[in-house]
């Protein structure tokens, strides 16, 4: 399991690579946030229910619906309209999800060559977009209404992008260059 790998192998390795004197200085993954945005389709209760069901299967816990904060005429949404769902994973469920993401989902993603450094936000957090949620093994292709995209945000307590990249490479994330 990734949690055991982190404690036994990754922490000592990063401590020497980054030159830290204390193990508490070593960066770690704090949480993983999953989001499915539906936009105007969120007002359809059938689509919204399938979105919630699929995200619950992917994450292993119940997602929360997200609502529009303000009206935008160009997108045909009004304040308070449901526009998607999200879930935040921490601790054991987070590590289980990351293991599935690294070893199953990313290799199954079509035209995936690796993660780029440009996907970091400058503070050590990584954002990944999965184009088709059917890449997850938990989703049965015959039971889905529409193929949805999933946004995955991996939040670390790393000081900068380089430390976060080293951390994620130790976990086995495939990076380009």
UniProtKB/Swiss-Prot annotation:
Gene Ontology molecular function terms on file: rRNA binding; structural constituent of ribosome; tRNA binding
Any one Gene Ontology cellular component term annotated for this protein: ribonucleoprotein complex
Pfam families recorded: Ribosomal_L5, Ribosomal_L5_C
The UniProt record lists the keyword Protein biosynthesis: no
Keyword annotations from UniProtKB, A to Z: Ribonucleoprotein, Ribosomal protein, RNA-binding, rRNA-binding, tRNA-binding
GO biological process, one term: translation
Entry annotated with the keyword Ribonucleoprotein: yes
Annotated InterPro entries: Ribosomal_uL5 (IPR002132), Ribosomal_uL5_bac-type (IPR020930), Ribosomal_uL5_C (IPR031309), Ribosomal_uL5_CS (IPR020929), Ribosomal_uL5_dom_sf (IPR022803), Ribosomal_uL5_N (IPR031310)
Function noted in UniProt: This is one of the proteins that bind and probably mediate the attachment of the 5S RNA into the large ribosomal subunit, where it forms part of the central protuberance. In the 70S ribosome it contacts protein S13 of the 30S subunit (bridge B1b), connecting the 2 subunits; this bridge is implicated in subunit movement. Contacts the P site tRNA; the 5S rRNA and some of its associated proteins might help stabilize positioning of ribosome-bound tRNAs.
Subunit composition and interactions: Part of the 50S ribosomal subunit; part of the 5S rRNA/L5/L18/L25 subcomplex. Contacts the 5S rRNA and the P site tRNA. Forms a bridge to the 30S subunit in the 70S ribosome.
Family: Belongs to the universal ribosomal protein uL5 family.
Database matches in HAMAP family: Ribosomal_uL5_B
Protein name: Large ribosomal subunit protein uL5
Organism the protein comes from: Ehrlichia chaffeensis (strain ATCC CRL-10679 / Arkansas)
């Amino acid at each position: 399991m990734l949690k055991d790998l982190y404690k036994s192998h990754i922490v000592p390795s990063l401590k020497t690579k980054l030159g830290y004197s204390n193990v508490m200085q070593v960066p770690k993954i704090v949480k993983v946030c999953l989001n499915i945005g539906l936009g105007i389709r969120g007002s359809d209760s059938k689509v919204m229910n399938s979105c919630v069901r699929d995200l619950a299967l992917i994450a292993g816990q119940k997602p929360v619906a997200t609502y529009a904060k303000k009206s935008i005429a160009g997108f045909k949404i009004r304040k308070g309209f449901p526009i998607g769902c999200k879930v935040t994973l921490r601790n054991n469920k987070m590590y289980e999800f990351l293991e599935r993401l690294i070893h199953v989902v990313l290799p199954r993603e079509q035209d995936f060559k690796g993660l780029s450094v440009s996907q970091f936000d400058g503070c050590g957090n990584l954002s990944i977009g999965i184009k088709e949620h059917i890449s997850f093994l938990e989703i049965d292709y015959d039971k889905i209404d529409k193929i949805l995209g999933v946004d995955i945000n991996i939040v670390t307590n790393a000081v900068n992008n380089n430390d976060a990249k080293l951390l994620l490479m130790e976990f086995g994330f495939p990076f380009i260059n």
